[in-house]
Amino acid sequence: MKKKHKRLLITSGIFCFLSCIVFFILTTLKENISFFYTVSEAIVLQNSQKLIRVGGMVVENSVIRSESEVIFQMTDFNKSVVVKYQGILPPMFSEKSGVVVQGKMFDNSTFLADTVFAKHDENYMPKVLKQIP
């Protein structure tokens, strides 16, 4: 085999190897990125039956608790959606606070949540630490 062909073969092999590495890195990063849709964007995705995350603010005086589920409204100050959730809410969940819910859009006004995440700003400090002088 000529030197020229050997060099071309080695260069092609290195290029293919590096391409595979970049592909696997990008695929892994895509799976680990946690983004969410706004309420307005999620309404457009109605009945997709795809697991999505939706972020917004809990509407004041909208939280209804029963023995089996919690129902509340979430808004992005443009549109609102009713969220139905069965489970224990995070301790920081409250009205007029930010939340991200994960689940499926049932119709253009109802979201069935599997998980509720309470959002907080960078100044958050747990109550236990606030009491320590």
Curated annotation (Swiss-Prot):
GO molecular function: heme binding; metal ion binding
GO biological process: cytochrome complex assembly
Location in the cell: Cell inner membrane
Keywords, comma-separated and alphabetical: Cell inner membrane, Cell membrane, Cytochrome c-type biogenesis, Heme, Iron, Membrane, Metal-binding, Signal-anchor, Transmembrane, Transmembrane helix
Membrane-spanning segments: 8-28
Cytoplasmic side: 1-7
Main location: membrane
Entry protein name: Cytochrome c-type biogenesis protein CcmE
Native source organism of the sequence: Wolbachia sp. subsp. Drosophila simulans (strain wRi)
